[in-house]
């Protein structure tokens, strides 16, 4: 059903290469150097690199079903979240598989002390010369054509012994090109609308915490802080959460939350510089609304680096990589003991699904599922490109296509679209949605999505995958949020605003459950499409836009006249099942078993 790591095996994985005394299977083979890069000299043979090896899983179906069972209200296992030890035991490969890989690493010269066997993942440090022998490849520096100062060590092809081919799912960094770009266009980028020192309380013009409280029927509810109810905020791309701005925001817009605070967890040398002059709009928005509405304990997870990128027109490699380092953050979180995990994780970043290597996207989605198994509600903004921006596939055959987004397309995250206006709320044009080309439609979504497709008929046929996971799941206000950043009030828009607002509501629902001696909600989607459905207000006005024939980063692109996903009765691919009604949801979750 979901996360079929071995359900689609690329042709190159079946190719074997005859070498002296052995056979090898090519894992990845790029046909050419990616556009925007030039090959330079080989690195020093002594240069060290940290590799991450994803082990092929044997219990995928069992694991998926367990996650669904413990996340479906009414099931006998509902709320029985797994400990780290239980999860690792479930996912740990057969001993012979681990031994086979570990023996290969040691035989290849990988220092035993550098190998970390984490069951379904194995991490190790190796020199370039050893890596070249082990993977039967050559590494080179590759330089950015437009910015020669940016370079990275990569290869175009690597292989493993054929006896290991079904055990080694992925090794990186190898063929994954990409580079850091500061504040690039991500699918959940924020749009600064205007600056003001006196933001209006007119909720049709400016959104504040008070507006959201009234709109989503939260009233004056303020939860008591609970160490079991931590809300985590993801910080990428050199975004820093500034304490001075946060305190001033609470003073102006959420005085009832006076005394709220957040801590910082540094992942992979991530920083949270308080005196930086860099734009910090995303971090300010996320932390101010997550805590301005929830009063939960909060952790800002600041992560350095970037993830791998498969270039497309919206994110061509030479300038526009904004992929985030999900793996670093996920491995860190999953290493934590149960009491240190956040109950809710809100992330306001993403990219076009096709820009992420397919195996990388499946491996990452599996890790999101692991967080869900441990009781974490993983929430992502759906994106800000409507039905798509470039609307063109990035394969050898360039085909006009609506572009779904990732990680919103992962079935084990809850994706949040955007609305605007009140009385009634309306779908906003930039709210990303659609259907995944990588992940099949999960069973909990079948009825809701099929109902929409039946009404859609043949419209947009061939431009999307009708069997794919539908995006988003829910929605919330996403336009003209007042925030305090670098000493001033500004308003911003994007599904980046919708995600932390929705996450705060989930944190408040968790507080109600904990007070009733019940477990936190955990992975949300089976609840949202099931018993929780009546707690959402259906959005039936407005729609998304896109495919206008122009990409903000690459100029002329295919145009699809009147391309849109319309908000309609029931689930739709712009607002999901609708916006939350806290009053109704609170009654549902208080007694839910």
Swiss-Prot record:
Using the chain's own numbering, where are the disulfide bonds? none
UniProt protein name: Probable tripeptidyl-peptidase SED3
Q: Which reaction does it catalyse?
A: Release of an N-terminal tripeptide from a polypeptide
Q: Name one GO molecular function term.
A: serine-type endopeptidase activity
The cellular location(s) given in this protein's UniProt record come to: Secreted, Extracellular space
Q: Where is the Peptidase S53 domain?
A: 206-592
Which residues are annotated as active site? 282 (charge relay system), 286 (charge relay system), 496 (charge relay system)
What the entry lists under PROSITE patterns is as follows: SEDOLISIN
What positions does the record give for glycosylation? 198, 204, 261, 275, 295, 554, 566
What domain of life? Eukaryota
Cofactor note from UniProt? Binds 1 Ca(2+) ion per subunit.
């Amino acid at each position: 059903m979901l996360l079929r790591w071995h359900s689609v095996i690329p042709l190159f994985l079946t190719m074997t290469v005859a070498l002296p005394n052995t056979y090898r299977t090519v894992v990845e083979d790029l046909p050419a150097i990616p556009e925007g890069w030039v090959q330079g000299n080989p690195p020093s043979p002594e240069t060290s690199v940290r590799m991450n090896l994803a082990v092929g899983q044997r219990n995928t179906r069992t694991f998926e079903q367990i996650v669904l069972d413990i996340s479906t209200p009414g099931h006998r296992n509902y709320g029985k979240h797994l400990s780290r030890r239980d999860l690792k035991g479930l996912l740990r490969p057969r001993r012979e598989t681990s031994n086979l890989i570990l023996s290969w690493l040691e035989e290849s010269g990988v220092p035993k002390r550098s190998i970390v066997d984490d069951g379904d993942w194995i991490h190790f440090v190796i020199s370039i010369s050893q890596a070249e022998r082990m993977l039967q490849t050559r590494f080179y520096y590759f330089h950015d054509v437009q910015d020669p100062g940016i370079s990275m060590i990569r290869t175009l092809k690597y292989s493993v012994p054929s006896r290991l081919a079904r055990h080694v799912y992925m090794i990186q960094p190898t063929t994954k090109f990409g580079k850091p770009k500061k504040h690039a266009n991500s699918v959940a980028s924020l749009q600064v609308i205007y600056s003001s020192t006196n933001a209006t309380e007119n909720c049709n013009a400016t959104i504040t915490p008070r507006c959201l409280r009234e709109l989503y029927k939260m009233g004056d509810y303020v939860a008591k802080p609970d160490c079991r109810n931590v809300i985590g905020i993801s910080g990428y791309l050199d975004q820093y959460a500034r304490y001075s701005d946060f305190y001033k925001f609470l003073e102006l817009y959420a005085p009832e939350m006076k005394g709220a605070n957040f801590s910082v967890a540094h992942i992979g040398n991530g920083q949270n510089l308080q005196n930086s002059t860099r734009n910090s709009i995303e971090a300010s928005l996320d932390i101010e609304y997550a805590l301005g509405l929830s009063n939960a304990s909060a952790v800002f997870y600041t992560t350095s680096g970037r993830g791998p990128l498969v270039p497309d027109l919206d994110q061509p490699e030479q300038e526009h990589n904004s992929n985030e380092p999900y793996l670093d953050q996920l491995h860190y979180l999953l290493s934590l003991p149960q009491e240190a995990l956040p109950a809710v994780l809100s992330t306001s970043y993403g990219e076009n699904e096709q820009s992420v290597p397919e195996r990388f996207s499946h491996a990452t989605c599996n890790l999101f599922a692991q967080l869900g198994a441990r009781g974490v509600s993983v929430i992502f903004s759906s994106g800000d490109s409507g039905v798509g921006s470039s609307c063109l596939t990035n394969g050898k055959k360039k085909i006009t296509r609506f572009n779904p987004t990732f990680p919103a397309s992962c079935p084990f995250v809850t994706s949040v679209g955007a609305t605007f206006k009140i009385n009634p709320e309306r779908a906003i044009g930039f709210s990303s949605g659609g259907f995944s080309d990588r992940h099949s439609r999960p069973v909990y979504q079948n009825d809701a999505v099929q109902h929409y497709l039946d009404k859609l008929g043949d419209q947009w046929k061939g431009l999307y995958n009708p069997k794919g996971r539908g995006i988003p799941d829910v929605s919330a206000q996403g336009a003209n949020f007042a925030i305090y950043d670098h000493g001033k009030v500004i308003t911003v828009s994007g599904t980046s605003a919708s995600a932390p607002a929705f996450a705060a509501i989930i944190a408040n629902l968790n507080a109600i459950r904990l007070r009733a001696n019940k477990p936190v909600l955990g992975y949300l989607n089976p609840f949202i499409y099931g018993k929780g459905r009546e707690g959402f207000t259906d959005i039936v006005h407005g729609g998304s836009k896109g495919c206008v024939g122009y990409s903000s980063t690459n100029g002329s692109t295919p145009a699809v006249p009147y391309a849109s996903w319309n908000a309609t009765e029931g689930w739709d691919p712009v607002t999901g099942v609708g916006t939350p009604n806290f009053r109704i949801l609170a009654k549902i979750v208080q007694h839910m078993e």
